């Protein structure tokens, strides 16, 4: 027994309990696959099946272990039930003020040739076109620590059978949120989704939204059709808003609110919220929040002045677990691998969000040995995913047995069995 045996046991039990909850109503082999994948990815910090298999320490050959996981991923596919179960787990942290941040990203495989439905995508990191897949995710920002909880994810290709458009993929995500949480929360999207069809979808279902407007859009302001950027520049800023950037710099911004409508939706009223002082051009947001709604200004702060958290969420998955380094080739397996990465990120996020009440979080954060630990005044808003993931990997790597003993059915003791009935 080493100094981490008890802590490793708690982590294993936590991963197993988490796997059982997100696999509720599913066959036991699926739950066992989930526990193995989450444990292996957490210890190895990789999405390579070879490294995951080594972390499991199974009493079979490495080749057989890789084959077993590969077959399991292929059979699992998208696994909507897992997504629904995790969304239900997050329900207790969701209310009418919750911000659902939606954004698209990419999984690039620039040198890939044998991957199914591989197409050209825009690599946001490199700023150029590469081979890969599109992703769409929604995360719910918790109130206490602004922790992003991944409640929806999907990997798709424009060349796959049944693909229609990016707008249709967005409508699928919105429908999932609608079926899970009803009209709770505020849907927020970046300017890439500034579309009349998207606004019609929101109004049709009575959902609150905040969308960053494209500067090419025209609006009807005081009875005249004008460019939205020109309309925003006329507003001087009525409300003062001090803001601390990610680097710690304090900026003093001003917020203006103006009622406008759109030429294609003239019967609907929007609030144009402009944030001055953050950049050279004002930040322009279109929302259907009412003028007197107290969430109007707070939502702006949570969504766009804290938007780096959802971007950090994407970056965390790619850097911590090497998500773009996957080797599975079928689209079903890629989706399953991405789903497991999101679920593991969700497991870390739940630990991080309970930081004030969790002894486990305190121990893991101490083990992570951050070079620049957060100050007490900034501890609540600290993005702790990297620290927790590092500590989990370190603790689990100290064990010589994977998670298989917790998954196995213990044999009956012959001591308590009658002769002939054992």
Language-model region placement:
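Active-site-proximal, Lys/Arg-enriched surface segment
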Residues: 38, 66-145, 256-259
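Short secondary-structure boundary/capping segments within folded domains
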Residues: 27, 41-44, 59-61, 89-92, ...
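Short alpha-helical "recognition helix" segments of helix-turn-helix
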Residues: 52
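Short, basic interhelical loop/turn and adjoining N-cap
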Residues: 55-68
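Short gly/ser-rich anion-binding loops that grip negatively charged ligand groups
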Residues: 42, 59, 72, 76, ...
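Single, function-defining residue in the core of a domain
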Residues: 1-48, 65, 113, 141-422
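Short acidic/histidine-centered micro-motifs embedded in hydrophobic/aromatic stretches
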Residues: 55, 72, 320
């Amino acid at each position: 027994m080493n100094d981490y045996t008890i802590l490793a046991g708690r982590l294993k039990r936590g991963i197993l309990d988490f796997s059982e909850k997100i696999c509720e109503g599913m066959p036991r082999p699926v739950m066992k696959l989930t526990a193995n994948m989450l444990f292996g990815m957490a210890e190895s910090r990789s999405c390579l099946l070879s490294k995951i298999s080594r972390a499991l320490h199974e009493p079979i050959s490495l080749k057989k272990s890789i084959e077993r996981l590969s077959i399991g991923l292929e059979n699992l596919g998208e696994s909507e039930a897992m997504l629904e179960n995790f969304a239900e787990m997050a329900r207790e942290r969701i209310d009418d003020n919750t911000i659902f941040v939606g954004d698209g990203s990419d999984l690039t495989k620039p040198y890939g040739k044998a991957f199914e439905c591989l197409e050209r995508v825009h690599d946001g990191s490199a700023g150029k076109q590469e081979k890969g897949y599109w992703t769409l995710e929604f995360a719910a920002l918790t109130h206490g620590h602004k922790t992003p909880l991944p409640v929806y994810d999907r990997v798709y290709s424009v060349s796959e059978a049944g693909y229609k458009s990016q707008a249709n993929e967005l409508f699928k995500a919105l429908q999932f949120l609608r079926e899970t949480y009803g009209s709770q929360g505020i849907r927020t999207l970046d300017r890439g989704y500034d579309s009349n069809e998207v606004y019609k979808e929101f109004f049709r279902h009575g959902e609150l939204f905040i969308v960053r407007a494209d500067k090419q859009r025209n609006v009807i302001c005081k009875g005249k059709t004008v460019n939205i950027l020109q309309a925003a520049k006329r507003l001087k800023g009525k409300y003062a808003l001090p803001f601390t950037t990610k680097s710690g710099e304090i900026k003093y911004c001003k917020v203006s609110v103006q009622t406008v409508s759109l030429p294609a939706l003239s019967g609907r009223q929007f609030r144009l919220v402009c944030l001055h002082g953050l950049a050279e051009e004002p930040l322009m947001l279109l929302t259907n929040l009412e003028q007197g709604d107290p969430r109007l200004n707070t939502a702006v702060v949570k969504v766009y002045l804290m938007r780096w958290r959802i971007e950090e969420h994407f970056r965390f998955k790619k850097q911590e677990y090497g998500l773009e380094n996957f080797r599975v080739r079928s689209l079903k397996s890629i989706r399953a691998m991405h789903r497991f990465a999101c679920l593991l990120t969700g497991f870390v996020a739940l630990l991080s969000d309970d930081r004030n009440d969790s002894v486990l979080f305190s121990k893991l954060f101490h083990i992570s040995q951050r070079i620049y630990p957060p100050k007490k005044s900034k501890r609540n808003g600290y993005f702790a995913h990297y620290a927790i993931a590092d500590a989990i990997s370190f603790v689990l790597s100290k064990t010589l047995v994977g998670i298989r003993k917790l998954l196995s059915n213990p044999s009956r003791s012959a001591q308590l069995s009658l002769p002939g009935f054992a």
